[in-house]
Amino acid sequence: MKRTIQGMLTLACGIFVMTDQTVWERAASADGTTPSERALATIARKAFLSLWSYTNVFTDEGRHNGKGDGKELCDLLVVFGNSVLLFSDKDCAFPRHSDIKVAWARWYRSAIEKSARQLAGAEKFAKAFPQRIFLDKGCVSLLPIALPDPSVARYYLIAVTRGSHQPARSYFGGGSSGSLMLLTHLYGRDHYEMPFHIGFPLDSRRFVHVLDEVTVGLLLEELDTVPDLVSYLSRKEEFLQQSDLVLSVPGEEELLARYMATTRDEEHAFPNIPSGTNFVALPEGDWDTYATSPQRVAKRKADEISYMWDGLIEHQSSFIRAGTAITAPWQPPGVVDHERIVRALAEQTRLVRRSLSADLRFALMQSESGRMFARIKMTGRPPSQAFVFLTIPRVEGEDYDTIYRTRRIHALTVYCHAVKDAMPTLTEAIGVASEPLSEDMASQDFIYVDLSEMSGNEMKEWRRQADDLEILRPKTEMKLFRDSEQEFPAPFEFAAPPPRYLGVGGRPVNRAERRQAEREQRRCRKKSR
């Protein structure tokens, strides 16, 4: 069934007087109850944007006859379409003990094991009782975003554990980054015997992403959109859970570096492991190589324009949370799913946002009296999604709401439907309409159209309306080009493929042994010259 969703926000020069905040607004501005939770909330809000991230949500477990406080579900909940991210944040001091294994086991139980069990319980509850999650401990305000149906939902469990960084640096020595190592043959209690190594904390082998105080910031700053982060988490789980293969990684940041520097079918990926391999160890130092590379510097510079897109999403979200988002004049406010509109904008990766922002800015710069301007961006191969950026100057004397805005919404609606005639493979269209930047005041209309099903008669009707507006016609001057922008302005490759390391008896080597092996390899190379 074809769906058309429209919404509007208004921007104008002037002073806004804030009234009482809505429950949704208060939830969006909540910062957590501890310093570590506040730190997590800050970086998460930047990456996930405030419409989809909620700190310290609760269930009604423990309440009886409407009395008592609810039970905390998790420290941070992100709900975005079919993706649900559950975060636990624990800041535990590392115990002092002469035996590092004893100290590690105690810290591991309180920081990682406890977090993993909490996250597994939160996932189980959310799937079973999605209508019993609240924004407050009194369980008065329900979560405003509906959780996806369990049959299509994808949950990610993320344990942020603080307190191990400095002890790990001291333990590994030799300039170690101090991040927790990943070792995939460890399960449950196996961890007690391997200080600062993480495999699968849960006996069920349900995957838990364990991040420390350093790697959580690196990860959420490098992959600062929901689709980018979810792709990484999903592919990481696949990479580390390959059957009959043990992987040793000297820290989450090293894994992230390999992911960012490896592409397959124009998407980030992890290195291919040759068939028959039973153990692979990634080298230490890849993150430093990647982080200081001119390619990454150029990427971050090129990404700057993309945050215009984030600003557009966040600004519209503020109206949705406040309950003041406006609908088309002919639409009842209650039938508009404003969240779906802005989610369509937020579903774009950082790279796509870069080009979309450039296209939007170009459209806003166009201003010719009496003429509308449209720029259409299509994504996918073959194209499945169309973005329509439309600017229409106001005509002096016309009423803004009854004439100008109605005219603009009609034109945007026709564009977002009739574009299907020009590209039959399209399944959805997202439109943004505004006055040009040259105007002294501007507002934006947004529209989301599901084009997956459109009958021949519907297509003819939209074609007729497009002809009436003299748009998208065969004789209309259109410029078509393929966007060839690369994420890294220059190709990025590491100097060598990941080496494999095995210690005595086939056991995985630790950081110190790994460095010793690398020094010996360098000496051998020098002697052979």
Feature locations, PLM:
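Intrinsically disordered, low-complexity Ser/Thr/Pro/Gly-rich regulatory segments
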Residues: M1-C74, V78-R514, R519-R529
